[in-house]
Swiss-Prot record:
Belongs to the LpxC family. One of its GO terms (cellular component) is membrane. One of its GO terms (molecular function) is metal ion binding. It catalyses: a UDP-3-O-[(3R)-3-hydroxyacyl]-N-acetyl-alpha-D-glucosamine + H2O = a UDP-3-O-[(3R)-3-hydroxyacyl]-alpha-D-glucosamine + acetate. Pfam families: LpxC. It comes from Leptospira interrogans serogroup Icterohaemorrhagiae serovar Lai (strain 56601). Catalyzes the hydrolysis of UDP-3-O-myristoyl-N-acetylglucosamine to form UDP-3-O-myristoylglucosamine and acetate, the committed step in lipid A biosynthesis. This is UDP-3-O-acyl-N-acetylglucosamine deacetylase. NCBIfam families: lpxC. Its cofactor is Zn(2+). It is an enzyme of class 3 (hydrolase). The active site is at H264 (proton donor). InterPro entries: Ribosomal_Su5_D2-typ_SF (IPR020568), UDP-acyl_GlcNac_deAcase (IPR004463), UDP-acyl_GlcNac_deAcase_C (IPR011334), UDP-acyl_N-AcGlcN_deAcase_N (IPR015870). Zn(2+) binds at H81, H237, D241.
Amino acid sequence: MKEILYRRSIQDTVRIKGIGLHSGKEVNLTAHPAPSGTGIVFEYRKGLEKASISAELSNVVDTSNATTLGDGIHKIQTVEHLLAAVYALGLTDLILEIDAVEVPIMDGSSLPFLQALESAGIIEYPEIVEPIYIQSPLWVVDGDKYLVLLPSDELKVTYTIDFNHPLLKGQSITVSLDREKIKQEILPARTFGFLKDVEALQARGLAMGGSLDNAIVLTQDGYLNQQLRFENECVRHKILDLFGDISIAGRPIIGHYLASKAGHALDISMAKLVMSNVTGDEISKYKSRRIPLFKRKAVVV
């Protein structure tokens, strides 16, 4: 029997402080509880400037190097690591107040966000979230890059990265996942980059907050970092990005993801493809017959 999922928020307000990857400047992020049905909403507050941007597919304005949400005037960059933690906790309703245009990079993974949000406590609402179960294959392709979604009653990912580097040539992983496994096996994986690219970006005034404290940095033939959290940490981080991006659909999308050299653009394209078919014959929703017959109140979990 498939798991019944309910809308969730946090119990208490929690504050998170870090630096922006590109600006190198301090960022203050405050997560607030929100009523059921609110969704995940970023509230930008900087002096007299204010903006409210929901984490929705229609608000994705850029997928180059990171995922950016915007309203046509304001933007919030690098949302995927935070949203991956939100996804793993099953949170559906949050106000995320931020005083900068990019989410803090923290240690380059989702772990600090996970720990902060968990420390605030989780409350579960009586309203049900309906996962989407794929009945026929879906795919998005860009040259030699692809992301395929196959029918499966469990969440599963097969991911391959293939960089021109001896340690990242054909690095691959297949994992079956649930919320707890995502927390333990995916969210601690840090972002990665190549030393030559970091130096070029910093020469242009970008990646000013990048360091060995918040990224895996690869030299021509090895790692600058002394220790990895996983032997295949880089490909695991790509799965982290995938979940952060797919979460913007607003409902869990269950299936077997097959990815090769994919990234934010294909992740978002897949989420849009799924949601465009959500009322069609290709998609099976979580049917109402699985809703309990008794009335359920909000509970702390």
